[in-house]
Amino acid sequence: METRSKPQLLVFLTLFSVLFSQTLAWPLFGAPSALRMGDRIPFEGANEPDQVSLKADTDILQDALAENDTPYYDVSRNVRHADGVFTSDYSRLLGQLSAKKYLESLIGKRVSNSISEDQGPIKRHSDAVFTDNYTRLRKQMAVKKYLNSILNGKRSSEGESPDFLEELEK
């Protein structure tokens, strides 16, 4: 029975230590985020005279720093943090704006406002293809007509040759 109780005891001690450390880390009356540097809760033994002596100590320290003119920090930590947060958010905003402008320029190039402006290159291409196909068809028809005239016995003296050259030149 002792062999079974040792693991149970170990689990119980581990659980107890975790719960005990949690209660020490977090007060029972508030959330962990409630305790910040500015929102400190005084100890039960702290009273008004202790606060006055603490303020006097900080005043002495500030006077000593003012006399030496060598503060540890030129800019307070909060100001530097706020500047860093602003800079980071501002650069992220500029990146988003430039990406948005680039995307709008791509969309603007693809989709235009007027239909005739958008169909210009497509219409010119289709016109060129049609002209090319039509010219090829006319040349084939002229060759076919010329071959039929030769096979039927008509000669160039009858006036077929100039028409054939005109058909080929078109």
Curated annotation (Swiss-Prot):
GO molecular function, one term: peptide hormone receptor binding
Propeptide: 26-79, 111-122, 156-170
Main location: secreted
Gene Ontology biological-process entries: adenylate cyclase-activating G protein-coupled receptor signaling pathway; epinephrine secretion; mRNA stabilization; positive regulation of protein catabolic process; prolactin secretion; regulation of protein localization
Note: X's at positions 28 to 44 were included by homology with the human precursor sequence.
PROSITE patterns: GLUCAGON (PS00260)
Residues that bear Asparagine amide: 152
Name used for this protein in its record: VIP peptides
Family: Belongs to the glucagon family.
Residues the record lists as Isoleucine amide modifications: 107
